[in-house]
């Protein structure tokens, strides 16, 4: 019987690059403008609705598609693809070296709620596009959008990555909700990234917390010793 290799599922935005890049802020502003334009509502109402959909569905676009019949691909072009990532994201050689070292022992997989175009852009500008065995993303062309923290999304990433044993899955994400969802789904190793200066979550959502993605390998050494 073949023993499955452990796999690390990495979130992308605000996880493999720091929040100080403020990409989330730029994205939020574009989403709000898109809401306001497409739905014909004031900016304040658009901001409120964006937050409601994000909290409830994991991604704002799912709420737009479900309740307003918005074209998700048009949303992607107007929001994600309009971000000037090339001016903001810098190549991260330390991260690259860590990932290449990890791949000697683990499968490494991107697991993001972004669309594939945005994900590929981020990986390219970070200089790590060749450091992963695959990528699972939110398919904006799908009839029914699924995203973290929906259980179906965790099922999908395991299926696409070819892993069946939940105890072989190691997941790192900055989102409390996504980490909690993964733990409730049954993944044993769920690691929330909480940057230095941000308060630690109470109660803790996952099995572990790290402050710096570049120190992730040190945590893996601890996990392997458990």
Curated annotation (Swiss-Prot):
This is Uncharacterized protein C24B11.05. It comes from Schizosaccharomyces pombe (strain 972 / ATCC 24843) (Fission yeast). One of its GO terms (cellular component) is nucleus. One of its GO terms (biological process) is nucleotide catabolic process. Gene3D superfamilies: 1.10.150.450, HAD superfamily/HAD-like. Signal peptide: none annotated. GO terms for molecular function: 5'-nucleotidase activity; nucleotidase activity. Belongs to the SSM1 family. Disulfide bonds: none annotated.
